């Protein structure tokens, strides 16, 4: 099962430098905190619609592969993050199998829990970078995060209903 928003997410083209954009737009795109929390601050009830979750091989993550360790399998999670039932963000998380050890095994068991609720409660979370991308008028971003030094890649596409626009 796929979703058109995830197809567009995978089509994002990334800027080599942070573009000169309106401050409000950059505030959303460069947010270091949880996007789930930001949506809730808008007075919304946040929920997850699961699109796809499970192990994949390298050939299913060509966009992410250069940014992650080369391994035989990766945990892939594709979701829509909804605010009061309306999709505001498409998310794609790729986790190398070597990251899935110790407390990070919980990444496989999030179910309908937003990723941000898990990540941003961890004292071991760090971020290597945020890259801004755009496709067909929609903005997105990707970040390589680390939990206890172990990497994962999160890509987010802001959908037309989101307050970023």
UniProtKB/Swiss-Prot annotation:
Gene3D superfamilies xrefs: Chorismate lyase-like
GO cellular component, one term: cytosol
Pfam families to which the protein is assigned, alphabetical: Chor_lyase
A GO biological-process term: ubiquinone biosynthetic process
Gene Ontology molecular function, alphabetical: chorismate lyase activity
Secretion signal span: none
Pathway in which the depicted protein is active: Cofactor biosynthesis; ubiquinone biosynthesis
Keyword set, alphabetical order: Cytoplasm, Lyase, Pyruvate, Ubiquinone biosynthesis
Catalytic activity: chorismate = 4-hydroxybenzoate + pyruvate
Domain of life: Bacteria
Localization (cell): Cytoplasm
Stated role: Removes the pyruvyl group from chorismate, with concomitant aromatization of the ring, to provide 4-hydroxybenzoate (4HB) for the ubiquinone pathway.
Family affiliation: Belongs to the UbiC family.
Protein name as catalogued: Chorismate pyruvate-lyase
Gene: ubiC
């Amino acid at each position: 099962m796929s979703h058109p928003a995830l197809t567009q997410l995978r089509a994002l083209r990334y800027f080599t430098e942070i573009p000169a954009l309106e401050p409000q737009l950059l505030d959303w795109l460069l947010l270091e905190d949880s996007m789930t929390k930001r949506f809730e601050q808008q007075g919304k009830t946040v929920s997850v619609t699961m699109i796809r979750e499970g192990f994949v091989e390298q050939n299913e993550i060509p966009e992410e592969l250069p940014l992650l360790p080369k391994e035989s399998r990766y945990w892939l999670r594709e979701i829509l993050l909804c605010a009061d039932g309306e999709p505001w963000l498409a998310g794609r998380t790729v986790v190398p199998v070597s990251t899935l050890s110790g407390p990070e095994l919980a990444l496989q068991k999030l179910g309908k829990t937003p990723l941000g609720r898990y990540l941003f409660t961890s004292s071991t979370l760090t971020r290597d970078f945020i890259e801004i991308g755009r496709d067909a008028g929609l903005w997105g971003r990707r970040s390589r995060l680390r939990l206890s030094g172990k990497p994962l890649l999160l890509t987010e596409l802001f959908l037309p209903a989101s307050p970023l626009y």
